[in-house]
Amino acid sequence: MLKVLGSFIIIAGVLGGYAMANGDMAMLWQPAEMVIILGAGIGSLIVGNPKEVLGEMLTQAKGVFIYRRRGEEFQRQLLMLLYELLETVEVGGLKALDQHIEEPEESELFNKYPLISQERNLMAFIADNFRLMAMGKISAHELEGFLEQELDAMEGALMQPSRSLHKTGEAMPGFGILAAIMGIVITMGHIDGSVAEIGNHVAAALVGTFFGIFLCYCLMGPLSNAMGLRIKTELSALECVRTTLVAHLAGKPTLLAVDAGRKLIEQDVKPAFKELEVWVNDFEEQRDAA
């Protein structure tokens, strides 16, 4: 909702200010200039990126406007899933994990936490790295190194669409100047026309410059930034899993290992340690009652 509101404010501010200065709205409609700028921009995106990145770019851009923030319930389910998995190891040993991590989609434990099981990448990351831990013969330091490399690779791949969009956005003023120069060339072909005719051609050329700058700073720049922030939010859950596993292998008790992961959750949605204790105590009471 905030993204839609922000977009409305941008358009209202730019066009509203132009209208307040008695600007002619019809002069802003220059299809030829828009074709030049959009064609150059879209073409450069296609030339510079593989189709996988382009597809992910569309998905991430759409997700900016329909994305639901991972709230407290998501964080609770993530932390309690990690707690239950580690408790399963404490009670039944590493072999007890097999029934859950081999086919996590069919695991009763994973299905207890639907917000996590809906996140395929996150669930696969949890299952794969608990499986790695279950194989044994790996130290906390080695696991931390492996997971850090994996997360770096994932971040690089997931951030590529926003980086590509940002670079193209930075080029849009240049494409606007390109369109403006072509407009001036057309104007020079009518140099013997009336002052009004020459003025209209110059105005059309300047609209190209305006459109390129508008796309850069009012659309593509903010959109690429929002895409990057969304990816960083998603990666924070993976960082939580990594830290929890490393702390467990380092010999920390289950609660402290999960709390180490809790500290990597984003500040505005991070539950307090007391909340984690309450959730764990409720789980322990239910398990004892059963």
Where in the sequence are the language-model features?
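Structural signature of hydrophobic alpha-helical transmembrane segments
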Residues: 3-7, 32-34
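Large intracellular
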Residues: 19-161, 233-290
